[in-house]
């Protein structure tokens, strides 16, 4: 996984990063996006939950209350809102500028002592590692519970048919 890499990781997000796209970005240390970027975890609208770490990483990054709201509602988040809540570090006008910003940050990090950078990353990440591991195991268990429900099938069917799903709690 990205977060297990010894070196810092930087994501550049341009456009929609919904569901797994947001979850992938959450795995990185630093996130830079364009002004047109959109984030969100819409899985509950399909009668499933974020299953790639979103329920564990998002609350750690932006706080439990806001994370619950975003996961429960499936609301989309604009780039500026993502910046204000701490979901991203920088918002740039376009992809080229976002990429330049990411490279600038990477170069700045590259000028620092590599052993110190690795140690700092390990110390920061290690502060919650055991809790994160348990949380990810719990998320996977809950994801498996919803994976084979009739509601999930209805959610996927409704999505494909571009209509609102009708759930029955089964």
Which role fits each region the language model picked out?
Residues 76:
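Short aromatic/basic micro-patch
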Residues 1-4, 12, 18-72, 85, ...:
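CoA-thioester-processing core
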Residues 70-71, 120-123, 159:
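Short alpha-helical scaffolding segments that buttress acidic/His motifs in well-ordered protein cores
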Residues 155-170:
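Short, basic/aromatic-enriched C-terminal tail that caps enzymatic domains
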Residues 32-37, 79, 88-137, 141-150, ...:
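C-terminal long alpha-helix characteristic of the crotonase
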């Amino acid at each position: 996984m990205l977060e297990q890499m010894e070196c810092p990781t930087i994501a550049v997000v341009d456009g929609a990063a919904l569901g797994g796209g947001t979850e992938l970005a959450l795995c990185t240390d630093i996130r830079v996006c364009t002004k047109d970027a959109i984030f969100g975890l819409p899985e509950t609208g399909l009668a499933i939950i974020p299953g790639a770490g979103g329920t564990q990483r998002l609350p750690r990054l932006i706080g439990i209350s806001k994370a619950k709201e975003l996961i429960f509602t499936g609301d989309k988040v604009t780039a500026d809102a993502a910046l204000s809540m701490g979901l991203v570090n920088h918002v740039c006008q376009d992809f080229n500028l976002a990429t330049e910003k990411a490279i600038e940050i990477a170069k700045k990090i590259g000028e620092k002592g590599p052993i110190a950078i690795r140690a700092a990353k390990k110390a920061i990440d290690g502060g919650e590692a055991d809790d994160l591991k348990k949380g990810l195991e719990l998320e996977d268990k809950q994801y498996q519970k919803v994976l084979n429900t009739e509601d999930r099938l209805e959610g996927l069917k409704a999505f494909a048919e571009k209509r609102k799903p009708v759930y029955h709690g089964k």
